[in-house]
C-alpha cells in the first residue's frame, strides 16, 4: 500500500466535495478547483473524509495512487488556505514594481521585463526587491514562480539574480589573477 495514498483526506468545514466518476470537484471559501484522477484510481467520501483507492497492485496503479491523493489534498488546502511563494531579488539595479496586476522587472537588460498575472494569481511587492505570488492552485503558483526565477537565474560568482526566499545558492570562487 502506498504510504501517502492510504492516508484519508479530512474535509474541513466550509468545503464541499463532489466526486463524479474520476472528476473530483472541491468548493471552498477561496474558490473552486477540480482534478481528473488518472485511469486506475478512484475516490470516495466516507465519514467526512476523502479516500483515494487503487483496484490492484500493478506498477502503474501503485505509482498513481500517492500522486492522486496528493493532487486531491492540494485542492482541499488550496480552497481553504491558498498557496504563497515568496521571492527575493539580489543585484545592483535589479528591482521589481507592480504595474496594475502585472509585474515589471528591471534586471540589467536593455528593456524592462513585464510578467502578466495569469487568472487566479495575485502578485504583491514589498519594497523593490521582494515579491510574493499567491493563488489557490499550487501547480499554477509554482509554475509562475519558476518562470519569474528563470528571468535571471542566480549567478554563482556574484550572487546576483532572482531566488526563492530562504534559498541558499552555492557560491564559487573566481579565478585568481597573476
From Swiss-Prot:
GO BP annotation list: cytoplasmic translation
GO cellular component: cytosolic large ribosomal subunit
Keyword Ribosomal protein found: yes
Designated name of the protein: Large ribosomal subunit protein uL6
Superkingdom classification of source: Bacteria
Keywords for the protein's UniProt record, in alphabetical order: Ribonucleoprotein, Ribosomal protein, RNA-binding, rRNA-binding
Protein family (similarity comment): Belongs to the universal ribosomal protein uL6 family.
Gene that this polypeptide is encoded by: rplF
Quaternary structure (record): Part of the 50S ribosomal subunit.
GO molecular function list: rRNA binding; structural constituent of ribosome
Record's function text: This protein binds to the 23S rRNA, and is important in its secondary structure. It is located near the subunit interface in the base of the L7/L12 stalk, and near the tRNA binding site of the peptidyltransferase center.
